[in-house]
From Swiss-Prot:
GO terms for molecular function: hydrolase activity, acting on ester bonds; succinylglutamate desuccinylase activity; zinc ion binding. Transforms N(2)-succinylglutamate into succinate and glutamate. Gene3D superfamilies: Zn peptidases (3.40.630.10). It catalyses: N-succinyl-L-glutamate + H2O = L-glutamate + succinate. It comes from Pseudomonas putida (strain GB-1). The keyword Nuclease does not apply. Binds 1 zinc ion per subunit. InterPro entries: AspA/AstE_fam (IPR050178), AstE_AspA_cat (IPR055438), Aste_AspA_hybrid_dom (IPR007036), SuccinylGlu_desuccinylase (IPR016681). This is Succinylglutamate desuccinylase. The lineage of its organism: Bacteria, Pseudomonadati, Pseudomonadota, Gammaproteobacteria, Pseudomonadales. One of its GO terms (biological process) is arginine catabolic process to glutamate. Zn(2+) binds at residues 59, 62, 151. Pathway: Amino-acid degradation; L-arginine degradation via AST pathway; L-glutamate and succinate from L-arginine: step 5/5. Its cofactor is Zn(2+). The active site is at residue 215.
Amino acid sequence: MLALGKLLELTLTDHEPAEKTQVTPKGARLRWLGEGALEVRPAESEDCGLDLLLSAGIHGNETAPIELLERLLHGVANGKIKPRARLLFLFGNPVAIRKGERFIEQDINRLFNGRHELSSGFEALRAAELEQFARVFFSKPGRSRLHYDLHTAIRGSKIEQFALYPYKEGRKHSRRELARLAAAGMEAVLLQSKSSITFSAFTYEQLDAEAFTLELGKARPFGQNEQVNLDKLEERLIRIIEATEPEGESSLDGLQLFSVSREIIKHSDSFHLHLPADIENFSELSKGYLLAEDLAEMRWVVEEEGARIIFPNPKVRNGLRAGILIVPDSGQRLG
């Protein structure tokens, strides 16, 4: 096993490798770019023209995706996986990963698209660094660009594995990419309708990548992810890396589509979310339900048919999103 193939071990021990570049038995070149960052370049004759960014550990306690990326990187490093795509592996928040905590000072996934410039602390600096890694990686013209930012959730979910598809004005969501997600085991996709401050939103909006946040189950410590089944995703990622995906896939069978109806923004310390603390993502809410209250008699009442809630979190900082109200989407606007 090449030393650079052990990116997780290097990250957990806060160790900088002496050898920054190594070549795999299949001729792929591994290059250490910085803490938690490794580029893989296929042999030039094998390059399929895809740049694939795989990120995990934006939240340090979300270990199943980190373990998945480590398995993929091991496969590349020992020659079992023969990459034809150019790859960038990123572990988002190394300090939080080492401590097994979601974040240390602030949520990195609320610091992209320039938001880090309005903040301070090492996590704001890390968000800027991650943006720069992605910007350089996706700077080569004439290549396809794909980014999967892998997460697990802090709560249970009625739909365990789902994706969030960022928004950019004038750009349609891709049916082909949705079919790829369905083949990777995603059960639902949330089609977003406004700009966001997450990592995948940055690469989608600013770098013209097809980009997704993938939610893959419940967050658990390292070595305790037996209940998080990522087999279909892992198989699909290997196919993407090796350029062996079936041609012409377009089926969205079994994939539920949702769109954002409203975001619930916490404006003050008086904010109160009228939901059980253990409510699951994608729980249905009936029309007329009083969802939340805040200062100045601000009230959120459910008005939509088929409404569901995801990411309810009344503990976020003032000014941030405390939940998303979503509704079923017909998919008629797909490109």
